[in-house]
């Protein structure tokens, strides 16, 4: 572009937006997800299904952009998930529900640290014990069928929730900023929601759902049941991902 025709004011505004989005993402990641170099997330395992090399590169290296425009496009796409999550949270609250946001399942599989972060968990004990996991995804266009990676992620969430139901591996950040660590799921729900869940997960109706949102439409996929996912396979994939990362020249980050 001819330098005499540059709109420096517009460029400056977009630069502020780009920098602000980056800082906001760093702060939110630190609060909600912690140091992602120290564990394997279910999203990492899901990305392995699409492209193992890209999934590992996304952990190992900070992306470099050729221009502010390129960086801004990437950051807006990344933030769209979080913007939609906020909108979905407001709609659930508006309907009268009390969702648990970003419930974390923190486990170890051998020497491999694994975490699952559930966008929304809806729980009730009336008329019967019920848990619904809702994963929110933003898409440019609504898919006709759910991708294998998304299905793996929600399947892993439901399977891990049931498998570790009565283990003290559930963490959640409250709106006050206080963090409840190392509760069982029934303990968390009793403490936060005053909902009584059985000690046996088999006595509870557990389903996972994926809500895909575009800029003007929405589509729900499900239900995904705990028994639809092979927990051992999921954990083995996490182990493979971790071992590949820690044997490279850089730590997973």
Predicted regions and their residues:
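Amphipathic, positively biased hydrophobic alpha-helical segments used for protein targeting
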Residues: 62, 166-168, 249
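Short, active-site-adjacent segments that bind or coordinate small-molecule cofactors and metal centers
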Residues: 251-253
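Metal-dependent nuclease catalytic cores that hydrolyze phosphodiester bonds in DNA/RNA
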Residues: 1-132, 152
């Amino acid at each position: 572009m001819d330098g005499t025709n540059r709109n420096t004011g517009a460029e400056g505004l977009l630069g502020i937006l780009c920098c602000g989005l980056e800082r906001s993402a760093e702060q939110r990641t630190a609060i909600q997800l912690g140091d992602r170099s120290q564990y394997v997330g279910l999203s990492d395992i899901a990305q392995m299904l699409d492209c193992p090399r890209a999934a590992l590169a996304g952990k190992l290296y900070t992306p470099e952009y050729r221009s502010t425009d390129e960086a801004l496009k990437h950051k807006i796409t990344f933030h769209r998930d979080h913007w939609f999550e906020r909108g979905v949270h407001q709609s659930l609250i508006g309907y009268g529900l009390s969702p648990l946001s970003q419930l974390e399942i923190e486990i170890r599989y051998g020497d491999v640290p694994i975490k699952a972060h559930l966008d929304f968990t809806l729980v009730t004990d009336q008329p019967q014990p019920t848990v619904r996991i809702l994963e929110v995804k933003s898409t440019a266009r609504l898919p006709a069928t759910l991708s294998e990676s998304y299905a793996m992620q929600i399947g892993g969430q439901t399977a891990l929730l049931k498998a570790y139901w009565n283990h003290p591996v559930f963490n959640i950040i409250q709106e006050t900023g206080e963090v409840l660590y190392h509760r069982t799921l029934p303990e968390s729900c009793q403490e936060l929601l005053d909902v009584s869940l059985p000690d046996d997960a088999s006595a509870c109706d557990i389903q996972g759902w994926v809500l895909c949102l575009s800029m003007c439409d929405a589509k729900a996929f499900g239900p995904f049941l705990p028994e639809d996912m092979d927990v051992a396979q999921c954990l083995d994939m996490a182990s493979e991902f971790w071992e590949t990362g820690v044997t490279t020249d850089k730590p997973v980050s």
